[in-house]
Amino acid sequence: MASVVDICNLALAHLGDNATIASIDPPEGSAQAEHCQRFYPIARDTLLEMHSWSFSTKRAYGAEVENTWSMWEYAYAMPNDASDIIAVIPPEARDDYSTTFTPETYPDFYTNYSPSVAAGQYVPQKFAVETAADGSEIILTNQKQAVIRYHAKITDPTKFSPLFTITLSWHLASMLAGPVIKGDQGAAEAKRCITLMNLYLGKAMEADSNARKIKPEHIVSWIAGR
């Protein structure tokens, strides 16, 4: 698996650089290493936000905290490593797409009843992410014993898929082109790198999506109503 330095050197190689940096934390002293130290975290984090990558998707039981808002029944602490929330689901749901909803697992079963709910099809649980009085982020929802699905802040490059790594190298190269090459040539090179980044991004997203084979479970309403 590629290291952070490997990804940085790959990005520099895309620009025709010698690509021989040995460290960016701390930077070894070269201008290239300093540029990589500045831009690598930005490139990584923005690319992580572009897709629901399977390697960054986690689920955890919500840790209930004090709820001071009457319009929501429950409040849960934001997972420490979460960057954003994907879904709030009942504890027995295998995925976001289907579960057998009952008055116990779906708080709005009666007030928002519909055939899709009775048939066991996925109905997203409403939630809001807000900041509590103490400055901590909390998740507000009506779901009891909620399971939180979220995107984690992934900094370990060994967790990245190979296509994500290649995409990240081109994304980083587009940011390095200006300070490394400079001028109009640097701007033109940045555009070339963005084009190739988008090409590999599509391939990476397709491969990542193919890794998930979730089929919504259909339960006819007369069975669900038993």
Where are these regions (language model features)?
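Short, intrinsically disordered N-terminal pre-domain segments
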Residues: 1-25, 225-226
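Alpha-helix capping and helix-loop boundary segments enriched in small/acidic/polar residues
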Residues: 2, 31-34
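Acidic-enriched, low-complexity/disordered segments with a strong bias for Aspartate over Glutamate
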Residues: 6, 17, 25, 45, ...
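Internal mixed-charge
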Residues: 7, 12, 111-226
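Intrinsically disordered, low-complexity, basic-enriched segments
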Residues: 21-30, 37, 41, 45-49, ...
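Divalent metal-cofactor coordination and adjacent catalytic microenvironments
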Residues: 34-115, 121, 125-127, 160-176, ...
